[in-house]
């Protein structure tokens, strides 16, 4: 991964990464990785919250979309970004989302 270009991360994704850490050393590793690879953490705005609630209404039943993933998708759409994720099941059906799935 090149360090020179900017990458964006929703605050929801950032919190999920920290939540998975088992100890303070892993917390530090996550923070250092985000900083060293120039990730910009994007906040939840009113528009993101509104769009995420619409996604929950539209996609939670047919595709199992949960609140956290709705916030992540809405953050990408509101910032005109392509979302890259291995969570293909939940994101592929969102019509206005630019999405690239991958298998780890």
Task: Locate each region found by the language model.
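PIN-domain endoribonuclease scaffold, especially VapC-family toxins
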Residues: 1-63, 67-81, 98
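Histidine- and aromatic-rich ligand-binding microenvironments
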Residues: 10, 65-66, 87-88, 103-104
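Short, active-site-adjacent cap segments at secondary-structure transitions
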Residues: 16, 90-91
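Short, flexible helix/strand-to-coil boundary loops that buttress conserved ligand/catalytic motifs
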Residues: 21, 95, 103
């Amino acid at each position: 991964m090149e360090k020179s270009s900017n990458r964006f991360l929703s605050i929801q994704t950032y919190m999920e990464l920290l939540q998975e850490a088992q100890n303070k050393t892993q917390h530090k590793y996550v923070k250092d990785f985000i900083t060293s690879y120039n990730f910009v953490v994007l906040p939840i705005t009113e528009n993101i919250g509104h769009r995420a609630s619409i996604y929950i209404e539209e996609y939670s039943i047919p595709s199992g979309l949960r609140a956290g993933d709705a916030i992540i998708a809405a953050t990408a759409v509101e910032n005109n970004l392509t979302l890259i994720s291995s969570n293909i099941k939940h994101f592929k059906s969102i019509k206005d989302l630019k999405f690239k799935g991958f298998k780890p």
